[in-house]
Each structure stands twice: as structure tokens, then as C-alpha cells.
Amino acid sequence: ATLDLVCAARWGYKRGALAKKKFIAIAGNIGAGKTELTSFLCRKYGLTPFFEPNEANPYLADFYKDMKTWAFRSQLFFLTAKFRLQRQLERSSGTTLQDRTLYEDAEIFAKNLHRQRYIDKRDWQMYWDLYETFSQTLAPPDLMIYLRCPVKTLRQRIRLRGREMEQDIPTPYLNRLNTLYEEWFSGYKLSPVLVLPTDKLDYVTDLVDRVDLFRQIEKHL
């Protein structure tokens, strides 16, 4: 801990950047490292985490087995759950970190399922109208951190973390999601964006990577 502080001071990192009330969102494909980064930052600096409610989604396991049947219901659950979660974090004091926002659910995951015709035109229009209504009432993030990661690395991490429902996710599905992430961030204007190549960073054990991460976050806030 002492070494962290010495190096952080040398590189210009200030804890004050995260001590103020800020909303940081962490985005990235399945297996990109969102939960790990959220947990790491919150553990190191006492921030408040808001994790994705995967385990609370009663449709998710069925969705991975039969996407066409369960896509709309699963995405609708995530949209409404994320809306309630984001309203909750707006009332929190201090800096909060959210592991995947409702923007990402709609712009990446639901849009991909609609393009694959797993969500039909009628359901999609209703979903999108609801998303636009929700998003207009929410304060956007102060910083969006995008964890960019190649599909090969995503597959390795998915296998290693061993979540049973994720093991049969098709590689083309992950490829399509990565494409949508790049499309979305090319036109994203809600907040500053910090792009991190997570297949090349080791902020957990590498002190230089860790200090560089803190410097970049501070720079964008």
C-alpha cells in the first residue's frame, strides 16, 4: 500500500479525483474484465460498486440455450433493472462505479439480438421507446471506461471463470458484439471515454500499469 502511494505521488495521481461524487461506468464485452476492474477500484479506494444483476435475471440461463425464445424477455429485465439501479446510484454519495449501464444493454446487446431477428420489429420498437424514455431521465456517466478485448482472449476468460451458462456462447455472437461496441463508441457523446486494451494490461499485479490506470482515470474526470 505504501509503495502504491509513493509511486502514485511520483506520477501525479491524486485521490481527490475519485473522492468527489462521480459516476464512472465500465463497458465491455462478455469476459472483458468489467467486474474485476469494478471490484479492484472499489476495493482500493472505498468506492460504491453497482454490479450487473445477472444472477437476478430469471431468463438468462434459458436465453443462452434458446436466444430467439427468451431474447426479448431477458433484455427487458435488464433494461428495467438497470434503470432502477442507475436511479439508486444517483442518490448515492461519493463516487460510484457501474458494471455495464442500460445504454450498453440497449445499444449493444438488444440491438444485436434485433439484427439477428431474435427480437422482432414490434417488440423492438416497444423496447427502444422504453429505452429512450428511461435514458432521457437519467444523468449520464462522468466517465465511460471501455474495456477493449479480442474475442480469442474473451473466450479464454469465459472458459476460466467457469460460469456454466456462458460456456456455449457462440464465437460469432461475441464477434458481433465486439463490432457493435466499436460502432457505438465511434459516435458516443454522452461523456468522456477511456479505452483500455485489457488483454495488454495487468493493473492487479503490475504497479506501473496500476499507476498508469489511475492517471488516465484522473485525466478524464
Language-model regions, residue ranges each:
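P-loop (Walker A) phosphate-binding loop of NTP-binding proteins
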Residues: 29
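Conserved lysine of the Walker
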Residues: 34
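Conserved substrate/cofactor phosphate-moiety recognition/catalytic segment
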Residues: 43-81
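Glycine-rich phosphate-binding loop used to anchor ATP phosphates in small-molecule kinases
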Residues: 70-139
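A glycine- and Lys/Arg-enriched "phosphate-lid" helix/loop adjacent to the NTP-binding pocket
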Residues: 108-182
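NTP-dependent small-molecule kinase module
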Residues: 155-221
